[in-house]
Curated annotation (Swiss-Prot):
Protein name: AP-2 complex subunit sigma
Cross-referenced PANTHER family: ADAPTOR COMPLEXES SMALL SUBUNIT FAMILY
Pfam families (alphabetical): Clat_adaptor_s
UniProt-listed SUPFAM superfamilies: SNARE-like
Quaternary data: Adaptor protein complex 2 (AP-2) is a heterotetramer composed of two large adaptins (alpha-type subunit apl3 and beta-type subunit apl1), a medium chain (mu-type subunit apm4) and a small adaptin (sigma-type subunit aps2).
Task of the protein: Component of the adaptor complexes which link clathrin to receptors in coated vesicles. Clathrin-associated protein complexes are believed to interact with the cytoplasmic tails of membrane proteins, leading to their selection and concentration.
UniProt keyword Hydrolase present: no
Cellular location(s): Cell membrane; Membrane, Coated pit
Domain of life the protein comes from: Eukaryota
Taxonomic lineage: Eukaryota, Fungi, Dikarya, Ascomycota, Pezizomycotina
GO biological process: clathrin-dependent endocytosis; protein transport; vesicle-mediated transport
Coiled-coil stretches noted in the UniProt entry, renumbered to this chain: none
Length: 145
């Protein structure tokens, strides 16, 4: 189970968070961001699944929270539900850390968001599944500032 990348984009397609676990050129990254947004933005939350076939034997697992799309590109043979739950776990940690997280928190506290992401995912793998452990580590990091 390995991630290729994680993207958080708003409804307009602005990328608020991007973490790349596979080597892509800058041109490829821009192209992938656009392709992912075009795939997930028009989908109906009520009647369509949160999994979309992508290219090169990969798929996009995504979840929409308010105006943000949290997207993960995973191998086609990986368990989609595990990554869907990992995305939800990441958002729960963000919610608890920031107190009802919003898009502005991602923009102005991006370094903290990347720290949280690095606590949950390491080298494209799900690393930590305990919310309390992640929040305790983040408290320790906050004390260092």
């Amino acid at each position: 189970m390995v991630l290729s990348f994680i993207l958080v984009q708003n409804r307009q397609g602005k990328t608020r968070l991007a973490k790349w676990y596979a080597p892509y050129s800058d041109e490829e990254k821009v192209k992938l961001k656009g392709e992912v947004h075009r795939l997930v933005a028009p989908r109906d939350q009520k009647y369509q699944s949160n999994f979309v076939e992508f290219k090169r034997s990969t798929k996009i697992v995504y979840r929409r929270y308010a105006g943000l799309f949290f997207c993960a590109c995973v191998d086609a043979t990986d368990n989609e539900l595990a990554y869907l739950e990992a995305i939800h776990f990441f958002v729960e940690v963000l919610d608890q850390f920031f107190g009802n997280v919003c898009e502005l928190d991602l923009v102005f506290n991006f370094y903290k968001v990347y720290a949280i992401l690095d606590e949950v995912f390491l080298a494209g793998e799900i690393e930590e599944t305990s919310k309390q452990v992640v929040l305790t580590r983040l408290e320790h990091l906050d004390k260092l500032e």
